[in-house]
Every structure is written in structure tokens, then in C-alpha cells.
Amino acid sequence: MLDLSYSLERVLQEDPAARNKWEVLLLYPGIHALLCYRLAHALHKRRFYFIARALSQLARFITGIEIHPGAKIGRGLFIDHGMGVVIGETTEIGDDVTIYHGVTLGGTGKFKGKRHPTLGNRVVVGAGAKVLGAICVGDDVRIGANAVVLSDLPTGSTAVGAKAKTITKDR
């Protein structure tokens, strides 16, 4: 299960409300979603796609966190208050990444192949942020709450804001 103990320690490090490993194991939906993902991912790699997706959907129903079994997730992912988190099929996540509630790591089209973001190590993605497309987010990047990221972010950078622009004129 790719070092459950390490994942529990990460939660204890990052969440001041976490008191002990048993509490984290039994009561933290981010851990439950991650455990289900690890099993679903193993099934997905062995081409048991339907069973993997079924397990993924069960985990989503129970936790409110949707992780596609095809995603590649490193060690020590911490999903805090994970309701509404979506991690797409071709997403790649490095080690010691922190994701808050309402985050989408999603695609921008329906084409096959790599269409979701790649996050480096020690990335923090704030609540409600949307990181979209086959982009690369470097190591040690901070993405602010509700930011919309559509292009690569270099190592050590901070991204904030949701800049929208009008694409049609008023009539």
C-alpha cells in the first residue's frame, strides 16, 4: 500500500487537529480515498479496469473525493478537508503534496493521451483551485485558493488568482 505509515505521519505533520495515527486512519476521508486509490490503481495496472473504476466510484461516494485509478500518485499525498477533490486519469502527483478541498486536477479536452497536470514534489494546492490541462507544476510550488492554472509553473513559484476574460460581446 505504498507506506501507509508514512501517509499517516504526513497527516500528523500537516494537520494540527490530528491527534494520533489511529484517529487519522479511522476518521480522515483523505486517507480512506488514498487507500482505495492505491488498491484501484493496482487493479488498473493489471487491466482490471471495471473493478478499479467501481472501487474508485465507491470511494467517491463514501469520501466525496474522486481519484481516477489511472492517476499516478507519489508518496505522502495529504488531502485535507477533501470534499470535492477531483484527480483526473492522466494526472501525475509527486511526493509530499498537499491538496485542499474543492481542488480539480483536470483536463481541458476530450482527446486521448496525456491531458491532465503533472505536479512536482512538495506542491501545495489551495482550496478550490483548478489546475487544468497537460501542464507541469514544478517542485515547491504554492497555488492559492481558487486559482485557475492553465500553464506551466516553474519550481518555487506561487500562483494566485482566477483571471477570466470575456469571450463574447454584449448584444
UniProtKB/Swiss-Prot annotation:
It catalyses: L-serine + acetyl-CoA = O-acetyl-L-serine + CoA. Its EC number is 2.3.1.30. Its main location: cytoplasm. Pfam families: Hexapep. Pathway: Amino-acid biosynthesis; L-cysteine biosynthesis; L-cysteine from L-serine: step 1/2. Gene3D superfamilies: Hexapeptide repeat proteins, serine acetyltransferase, domain 1. This is Serine acetyltransferase. The lineage of its organism: Bacteria, Pseudomonadati, Campylobacterota, Epsilonproteobacteria, Campylobacterales.
